[in-house]
A protein has these predicted regions:
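Conserved catalytic core of the tyrosine transesterase superfamily
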Residues: 1-186
Length: 186
């Protein structure tokens, strides 16, 4: 399976690889069959766009269930980042944390960076995809842009230090360009 060929309209620069939603769902389905932790970790990364170093440091105390927010401590370039979480993932996360039943505040996903890279690669291989954890972050951003999210808001959600970093996600597949072109009436 191949990644999507994408371009920035301004200078046809290749941008980061990403997965279509269907590909992410396929990977999540494979993970769910093997491990609840792996499934939730991958879903959390895709639905929040967090980096590996950020997800492995999330503790139960970082989760604000009432506000559907997770506080990411030690976020790259910032002391803290607040990411939003959809209700379904929040519910799964709540159930998972309750099942951990630990009196302390250990990481929700007690796993190393190398282990995250390995499991992402393993589940990607099930769909013949050569991916890495940051592919999920890129996919998160692309899906939000395609859904109409403004770049400034995506910048805040992603924790990017500048808007120019976020602009890389203003990309279009060949099919997207064709569809937009055909909608124009001459």
């Amino acid at each position: 399976m191949r990644f999507n060929k994408t371009y920035l309209l301004s200078n046809a620069t290749k941008i980061p690889d990403y997965l279509e939603k269907e590909q992410v769902v396929e990977i999540l389905r494979a993970a769910k069959l093997c491990s609840q932790r792996d499934f939730l970790l991958l879903r959390f990364m895709w639905r929040t766009g967090v980096r590996v170093s950020e997800v492995i440091n999330v503790t139960p105390n970082d989760i604000e269930y009432k506000n559907s927010v997770v506080n990411i401590r030690k976020a790259k370039g910032r002391p803290q980042l607040r990411v939003l979480l959809d209700q379904e993932t929040l519910r799964m996360l709540s159930d998972y944390v309750l099942a951990l039943n630990t009196p302390e505040d250990p990481p929700v996903f007690p796993i190393s960076r190398a282990q995250v890279f390995n499991l992402v690669k393993r589940y990607g291989d099930t769909g013949d995809l050569k991916i890495h954890p940051h592919t999920l972050r890129h996919s998160f951003a692309i899906h939000l842009v395609r859904s109409g999210m403004e770049l400034r808001r995506l910048q805040l959600l992603s924790g990017h230090s500048s808007l120019s970093i976020t602009q890389v996600y203003l990309q279009f597949k060949d099919d997207d360009l064709r569809e937009a072109y055909e909608r124009v009436s001459f």
